[in-house]
Curated annotation (Swiss-Prot):
It is found in: Plastid, Chloroplast thylakoid membrane. The modification N-acetylthreonine is found at T15. It comes from the Eukaryota. It is a multi-pass membrane protein. InterPro entries: PS_antenna-like, PS_II_antenna-like_sf, PSII_PsbC, PSII_PsbC_sf. This is Photosystem II CP43 reaction center protein. Residues 1-14 form a propeptide. GO terms for biological process: photosynthetic electron transport in photosystem II. It holds the Pfam family PSII. GO terms for cellular component: chloroplast thylakoid membrane; photosystem II. PSII is composed of 1 copy each of membrane proteins PsbA, PsbB, PsbC, PsbD, PsbE, PsbF, PsbH, PsbI, PsbJ, PsbK, PsbL, PsbM, PsbT, PsbX, PsbY, PsbZ, Psb30/Ycf12, at least 3 peripheral proteins of the oxygen-evolving complex and a large number of cofactors. It forms dimeric complexes. The modification Phosphothreonine is found at T15. The chain crosses the membrane at residues 69-93, 134-155, 178-200, 255-275, 291-312, 447-471.
């Protein structure tokens, strides 16, 4: 059959233009994709695509293990984690491994074990990736029909979706089991400055858990990022674990309804676009969580939030000047407002000065000093504990801010040399990567929709100037 265009000049979305061609190779002629298109060459080769995905998982796990051991090798117990540029050890510490009261690291061996386990796992995954890429069957449908698939098989696709959902649900329950039965997790709100504890009474009330979803994402509401206790965190994982597992079973046992069959595009590239969109959404949520939340991301390990550092500075100077004889209740600042304390718009007693903008900040080192109407003057005069002073002094000099001038009253120039908060790293990296994933979602969604609608795929190159130029030799 005569083809209208050269296959070398046409890049395909899902199917080859010439249906008579073999799909067994990995070159441009047989797949319609050049080498730099990567896994697109394997769209119809389920065995080889499995190898690519397993190898990719191996690379991810290898990075986790190697970076884990790198951080362990460079870790200095005398310094806080957030001062050492660590991003993996804080996650392990949050899970309750190797830490004691106040977030003090008392044993680094669990971190070493974690790194080694990840490296061993990456070797297994790497072997599987190489095997399925080079040795195993090119397609799974004939030899292993359970693992085989056709992209347009709607029932098979939802079955695969269901299996993935169940695996995610089990993952959510791993945190629940760790928190409730296997040693507990680190709770920054534990009395006395945080500690590892067993979560014995996780929140199961749907009104509380789903109430977070109904909150506004703006202002003081904070949507799900406003969670401020470990009972709600673990209870939320119980709910999401149940929903994922039961949703997975549902998708395995049922076939897509008619409206779903009509609404979605059922092709490999469409599934890729859906996945990229979901990852982008989760990346943006993770960005906000790591920046604003100090419960799931304890400040003992990740450093203070911006508002927390600002409030810590106001608190530190209040403690200092009160010892020097200042009347913290009535002293005025240069603007006539309270220098140390003032009233919020709703009448609560709050810290004065420029940190007033963060008056609704909540942090475990300051909450014990509050009363029914904001900060309690009697507690500020008589009940401040040494650990609160030490922590606020540490936090005020480790704001997660990239500015050389004052932001929110924080004297950031003292942070300008050799300090970038893990919150800054995590928030900016997740925001940026989520944006790129979202662009990928739009790109692949557009291509998948065009293919489904029968539009011309690829770029018309018949009139491309370079095709009419003399060869270089």
């Amino acid at each position: 059959m005569k083809t209208l265009y050269s296959l070398r000049r046409f890049y395909h979305v899902e199917t080859l233009f010439n249906g008579t061609l073999s799909i067994s190779g990995r070159d441009q002629e047989s797949t319609g994709f050049a080498w730099w298109s990567g896994n697109a060459r394997l769209i119809n080769l389920s065995g080889k695509l499995l190898g690519a995905h397993v190898a990719h998982a191996g690379l991810i796990v290898f990075w986790a293990g190697a970076m884990n051991l790198f951080e362990v090798a460079h870790f200095t117990p005398e310094k806080p984690m957030y001062e050492q540029g660590l991003i993996l050890l804080p996650h392990l510490a949050t899970l309750g491994w190797g830490v004691g009261p106040g977030g003090e690291v008392i044993d680094t061996f669990p971190y070493f074990v974690s790194g080694v386990l990840h490296l061993i796992s990456s070797a297994v995954l790497g072997f599987g990736g190489v095997y399925h890429s080079l040795i195993g069957p090119e397609t799974l449908e004939e030899s292993f029909p359970f693992f085989g698939y056709v992209w347009k098989d709607k029932n098979k696709m939802t079955t695969i979706l269901g299996i993935h959902l169940i695996v995610l649900g089990v993952g959510a329950y791993l945190l629940v089991w760790k928190a409730c039965y296997f040693g507990g997790v680190y709770d920054t709100w534990a009395p006395g400055g945080g500690d590892v504890r067993i979560i014995t009474d996780p929140t199961l009330s749907p009104a509380v858990i789903f109430g977070y979803l109904l909150k506004s994402p703006f202002g003081g509401e904070g949507w799900i990022c406003s969670v401020d206790n470990m009972e709600d965190v673990i209870g939320g994982h119980i709910w999401i674990g149940n929903l994922l597992i039961f949703g997975g079973i549902w998708h395995i046992l049922t076939k897509p309804w008619a409206w779903a069959r009509r609404a979605f595009v059922w092709s490999g590239e469409a599934y890729l676009s859906y996945s990229l969109g979901a990852i982008a959404t989760m990346g943006w949520i993770a960005c906000c969580f790591s920046w604003f939340n100090n419960t799931a991301y304890p400040s003992e390990f990740y450093g203070p939030t911006g508002p927390e550092a600002s409030q810590a500075q106001a608190f530190t100077f209040l403690v200092r000047d009160q010892r020097l004889g200042a009347n913290i209740a009535s002293s005025q600042g240069p603007t006539g407002l309270g220098k140390y304390l003032m009233r919020s718009p709703s009448g609560e007693i709050i810290f004065g000065g420029e940190t007033m903008r963060f008056w609704d900040c909540r942090a475990p080192w300051i909450e014990p000093l509050r009363g029914p109407n904001g900060l309690d003057l009697n507690k500020l005069k008589n009940d401040i504990q040494p650990w609160q002073e030490r922590r606020s002094a540490e936090y005020m000099t480790h704001a997660p801010l990239g500015s050389l001038n004052s932001v929110g009253g924080v004297a950031t120039e003292i942070n300008a040399v050799n300090f970038v908060s893990p919150r800054s790293w995590l928030a900016t990296s997740h925001f940026t990567l989520a944006f790129f994933f979202f662009v990928g979602h739009l790109w692949h969604a557009g291509r998948a929709r065009a293919a489904a609608a029968g539009f011309e795929k690829g770029i018309e190159r018949e009139t491309e100037p370079v095709l009419f130029m003399k060869p270089l030799d």
